[in-house]
Amino acid sequence: MACMLCCSPLPALSSPATGGAAVVGFSSSSRRKAAHVHPAVAVKDHDLSSSSPAACGDEGGGAVVIEEEAHPSMMMSVAAPAMKKKAVAARWRPPRLVVPAVAGADEAMAAAAAVKAAKEKEEEEAMEVEGEGFWVASRRGLRHAMEDGYGVITHKIEGHSQMAFYGVYDGHGGRAAVDFVAGRLGNNVVAAAEKQRLSEKASSPAAADHVAAAIRAAYLATDSEFLSQGTRGGACAATALVIDGDLYVANLGDCRAVISRHGAAAALTSDHTPARDDERSRIESSGGYVSCGSNGVWRVQDCLAVTRSFGDGGLKRWVVAEPEVSRTPLAGAGCEFLVIASDGLWNKVSNQEAVDAVAAGHYSVDSCRRLVDMARRRGSRDDVTVMVVDLKRFLNC
């Protein structure tokens, strides 16, 4: 009887049918075959890395295969020893190795991830800008997406700033209006002022009035351009234009501009709200009404808390876009700097507090950040945007 013994070790082969257990194969033959388990190598060649019962089944189980011509009675005689050896081999498997987790490791990793995510979110929600003679800090509120914006335009002649525009904008009802105003208003104001400047001498008695009129026209033109798009929402604004030694400040709504003269704060704008007697009278004379809610906030048509703004087409009959404009000569007035901010600051910080904070920070982005943080600590849930403009760079006031 011819016999071939395959006893050389074979590398384990991964097989879906056996869950990765070792499979020992043999060549096919046209003769009848019988699988014999050799007692000496049945356990040695068995793959002990698997705990699956299927890995120890009839597909080989790591046993040596003997191919021979055999009588049926011989096949029966080797079946029982093979099953017995497989059972013994199963009992010899080492226990499953379990590596215990370090106490508190998961909690520490989760806490670190939360801190990182919070820091990234804060960086996305906060913005700081350090420009040439101006600084900006802004932070998103807690109630909705960021709806504040700002704009700066400077014109230089022979290396000196002869004209500059600065603006802070506070949107409501989405970002459409504030984005439009931030992109258009500054250009419209500068173009109108430059046209007026070229048409007459700055020293003429009517020049200042004409510049103020040009600023009003630029505001109204910007509003008309936005309304023509049929887009909802609105925006408040406070802007400053420095031209030929004069400071022109204009505003709509409750954005505010405050100047520091020898350390004393003075508001150059007046908030446009229904709480103002003259604004309430204007609205009522136009057929509208104002009301005070349970939270003490006055609103136009039970809707809007400001009486002048860009956009707000449904209320345009009463909520106009014509700004109030003031002129301040810079020469000899002790002018130091200008603070322009959205109502997220002014609802929590007084004019003098803002001036004191900027003076203590020596005109820097840190001053703006300090004011933003002050408003948040005092409970402001609104967007807060603060811009500081150095006025001394235009003239030695």
Curated annotation (Swiss-Prot):
One Gene Ontology MF term: protein serine/threonine phosphatase activity
Residues holding Mn(2+) 2: 170, 343, 382
Domain PPM-type phosphatase: 133-391
The reaction(s) this protein catalyses: O-phospho-L-seryl-[protein] + H2O = L-seryl-[protein] + phosphate; O-phospho-L-threonyl-[protein] + H2O = L-threonyl-[protein] + phosphate
Alphabetical list of Pfam families matching this protein: PP2C (PF00481)
Cofactor mode of binding and number, as noted: Binds 2 magnesium or manganese ions per subunit.
Source species, domain of life: Eukaryota
UniProt GO BP: signal transduction
InterPro entries: PP2C, PP2C_BS, PPM-type-like_dom_sf, PPM-type_phosphatase-like_dom
E.C. number(s) listed in UniProt: 3.1.3.16
Required co-factors: Mg(2+); Mn(2+)
Residues that, per the record, bind Mn(2+) 1: 170-171
PROSITE patterns listed in its UniProt record: PPM_1, PPM_2
Swiss-Prot/TrEMBL keywords: Hydrolase, Magnesium, Manganese, Metal-binding, Protein phosphatase
The family this protein is said to belong to: Belongs to the PP2C family.
Protein name, entry field: Probable protein phosphatase 2C 74
Organism: Oryza sativa subsp. japonica (Rice)
